[in-house]
Amino acid sequence: MFKRKSTAELAAQMAKLAGNKGGFSSEDKGEWKLKLDNAGNGQAVIRFLPSKNDEQAPFAILVNHGFKKNGKWYIENCSSTHGDYDSCPVCQYISKNDLYNTDNKEYGLVKRKTSYW
C-alpha cells in the first residue's frame, strides 16, 4: 500500500520546507491588508460588482439530498444542479416509486433541497 522512501529524500524535503518561514512574503505590496485601530478592530466595505454578462445569475444554485434512512446518512449533491435529472439515483428512486403521489412522508424525507449561494 505505502512505499518506503529513503530517509535522505525525506530529510531533503524537510530542509526545503524549513527554509520557507511564514508561508508567504508579508512584503507583498499588491496584497490588501485590513487596517486595525488601537483596539484591534478593523472595518471594510465589500462591494458586489455586476457580472460581465447579463445571462449569469449573481448567485450559485446547489441542489442536494440529505437524509437518514435505516440508521445511515445519505448526503450528496444532486446532478440536477447541472440540469442532469437522469443520473441522480435518489431522483430515479423518487420517480420510479412515484413517491410524490404515493408516500408523502418518505418523499418529504428524500426530496431535493435547493440552496442559493
Swiss-Prot record:
GO terms for biological process: DNA recombination; DNA repair; DNA replication; viral DNA genome replication. The keyword Membrane does not apply. Keywords: DNA damage, DNA recombination, DNA repair, DNA replication, DNA-binding, Metal-binding, Repressor, Viral DNA replication, Zinc. Residues 3-7 are annotated as: LAST. It comes from the Viruses. Zn(2+) binds at H65, C78, C88, C91. One of its GO terms (molecular function) is metal ion binding. The keyword Transcription does not apply. Belongs to the Tequatrovirus single-stranded DNA-binding protein family. Single-stranded DNA-binding protein that participates in viral DNA replication, recombination, and repair. Coats the lagging-strand ssDNA as the replication fork advances. Stimulates the activities of viral DNA polymerase and DnaB-like SF4 replicative helicase, probably via its interaction with the helicase assembly factor. Together with DnaB-like SF4 replicative helicase and the helicase assembly factor, promotes pairing of two homologous DNA molecules containing complementary single-stranded regions and mediates homologous DNA strand exchange. Also promotes the formation of joint molecules. The acidic C-terminus is involved in modulating the ssDNA binding properties. The N-terminus LAST motif is involved in the cooperative binding of the protein to ssDNA. Homodimer in the absence of DNA, monomer when binding DNA. Interacts with the DNA helicase assembly protein; a ternary complex between the helicase assembly protein, the single-stranded DNA-binding protein and ssDNA is an obligatory intermediate in the helicase loading mechanism. Part of the replicase complex that includes the DNA polymerase, the polymerase clamp, the clamp loader complex, the single-stranded DNA binding protein, the primase, the DnaB-like SF4 replicative helicase and the helicase assembly factor. Interacts (via C-terminus) with the viral SF1 dDA helicase. This is Single-stranded DNA-binding protein. It comes from Enterobacteria phage RB70. The gene is 32.
